[in-house]
């Protein structure tokens, strides 16, 4: 026990202890039990937690062991994460991560927030008001204006019935309810999964002319905004396919994996950029080159349908997850200046909504705000 330590120093030390150890310490000290529920402490702990890697594969969530050691680099599945509480067979088709919480869309179009470390869940009801559910997106974020306590929200984007434009809804955990809002500023197409960083969500997107942009949704103001890219996209070009995917780097920066494939010349290039400053400090984005992959050097043409990737800045390597539609295979690659190694391959199941994902995840004790209890003992959801 740290009974002789100043309270601030004790808190500082405990904020650096892994979540697995904190969970064991909770029942040993009433003061610590209270501290481990304090939002400000949890915020500090999540920011310092050592991140783990999980993967969504074949409608299940797996923990991964990633070894980045040159020619001995590997990715191994170490086990399936425990099933969601109160459900024996939940199949998950999509995941977004925020502060150690996973927002999961199930195979039967239900929505649940899950802390896989504590096992806590909260099912979120929503009413489908569009026949185009296949094209809807959910992301989890928070209003970060209150530095001591985050106000979590869910953004739902879906195709409307008029001109197939996007419509938007917000779910607030504080009020336990959905509401629609209107914002015409996006006027673009989402080209990648959303990545939540410091409470806000970012997408690689393209405008009506095919020019690429970074789109940000601010959960505090509930407004979209456009941010700068390192390169200028010239719009649609015949026989040229350009794709981009975003990833978070140590919960501080954004990384962009960009691929350009020339179908006429059967050539491709892959570039990865990382933002120069921490997201919380930047009003706009400035980028630096991180990695350029010479496809001809490794005798590969291109990756196909890259859905997610993870960056190791120190080793200057990335782990990439993609799907080969022609061969109907899911694949993991480790890519660096001198390595391009396939480390995992498996038969893909289902359509694109079932494609695999790599997620950097920080085990945390963050609690999920539950719905109000109504007469009869059931929670209002």
From Swiss-Prot:
F-box domain span: 1-45
PROSITE patterns: FBOX (PS50181)
Keywords recorded for this protein, A-Z: Kelch repeat, Repeat
Pfam families: F-box, FBA_1
Repeat listed as a keyword: yes
InterPro entries for the chain: F-box-assoc_dom_typ1, F-box-assoc_interact_dom, F-box-like_dom_sf, F-box_dom, SCF_F-box_component
Annotated protein name in UniProt: Putative F-box/kelch-repeat protein At3g17570
Species this protein is from: Arabidopsis thaliana
């Amino acid at each position: 026990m740290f009974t002789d330590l100043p309270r601030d120093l004790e808190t500082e030390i405990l904020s650096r202890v892994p979540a697995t150890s904190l969970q064991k310490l909770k029942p040993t000290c009433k003061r610590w039990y209270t501290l481990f529920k304090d939002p400000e402490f949890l915020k500090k702990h999540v920011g310092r937690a050592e991140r783990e890697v999980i993967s969504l594969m074949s409608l299940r969530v797996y923990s991964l062991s990633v070894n980045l050691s040159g020619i001995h680099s590997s990715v191994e599945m170490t086990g399936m994460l425990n099933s969601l509480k109160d459900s024996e067979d939940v199949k998950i088709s999509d995941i977004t991560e925020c502060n150690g919480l996973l927002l999961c869309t199930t195979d039967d179009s239900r929505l649940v927030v899950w802390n896989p470390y504590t096992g806590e869940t909260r099912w979120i009801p929503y009413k489908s008001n569009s026949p185009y559910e296949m094209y809807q997106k959910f992301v989890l974020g928070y209003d970060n204006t209150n530095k001591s306590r985050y106000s979590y929200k869910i953004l739902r984007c879906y195709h409307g019935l008029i001109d197939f434009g996007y419509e938007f809804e917000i779910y607030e955990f504080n009020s336990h309810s959905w509401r629609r809002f209107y914002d015409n500023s996006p006027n673009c197409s989402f080209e990648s999964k959303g990545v939540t960083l410091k409470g806000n969500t970012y997408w690689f997107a393209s405008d009506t002319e095919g020019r690429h942009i970074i789109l940000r949704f601010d959960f505090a103001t509930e407004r979209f905004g456009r941010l700068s890219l390192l390169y200028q996209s010239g719009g649609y070009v015949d026989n040229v396919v350009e794709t981009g995917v975003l990833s978070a780097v140590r919960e501080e920066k954004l990384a962009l994996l960009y691929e350009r494939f020339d179908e006429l010349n059967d050539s491709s290039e892959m570039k990865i950029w990382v933002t120069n400053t921490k997201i919380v400090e930047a009003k706009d984005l400035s980028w630096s080159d991180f990695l350029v992959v010479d496809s001809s050097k490794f005798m590969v043409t291109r990756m196909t349908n890259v859905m997610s990737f993870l960056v190791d800045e120190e080793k200057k390597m990335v782990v990439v997850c993609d799907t080969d539609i022609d061969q109907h295979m899911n694949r993991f690659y480790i890519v660096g200046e001198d390595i391009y190694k396939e480390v995992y391959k498996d038969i893909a199941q289902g359509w694109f909504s079932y494609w695999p994902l790599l997620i950097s995840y920080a085990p945390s004790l963050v609690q999920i705000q539950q719905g109000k209890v109504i007469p009869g003992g059931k929670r209002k959801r």
